[in-house]
């Protein structure tokens, strides 16, 4: 039987970060990936609105031969979130 797409995605993410996918039951964590220092939650959807934004930024960045990075913040919250494609992470 073929692996569910979300399980395969969790395995890819785990491998990328050097962790192991957690089964639903019997693990010490509720994270999707067991890792020594990171709490990794994986979300696979048909479409994420933030990725639609990232696609638009990527098109403009390519025209300038630059690496696309999206920074997100919420009013009144300190700091910000950084969205970078896994293929581009080593370029930063």
List PLM regions with ranges:
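Catalytic phosphate/metal-binding cores of nucleic-acid and nucleotide-processing enzymes, i.e., regions
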Residues: 1-92
């Amino acid at each position: 039987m073929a692996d569910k797409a979300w399980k395969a995605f969790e395995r890819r993410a785990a491998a990328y970060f050097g962790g192991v996918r957690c089964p639903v039951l019997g693990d010490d964590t509720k994270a999707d990936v067991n890792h020594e220092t990171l709490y990794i939650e994986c979300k696979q959807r048909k479409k994420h609105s933030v990725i639609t934004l990232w696609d638009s930024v990527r098109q403009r960045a390519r025209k300038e031969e630059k690496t696309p990075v999206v920074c997100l913040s919420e009013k009144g919250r300190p700091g910000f979130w950084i969205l970078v494609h896994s293929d581009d992470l080593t370029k930063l």
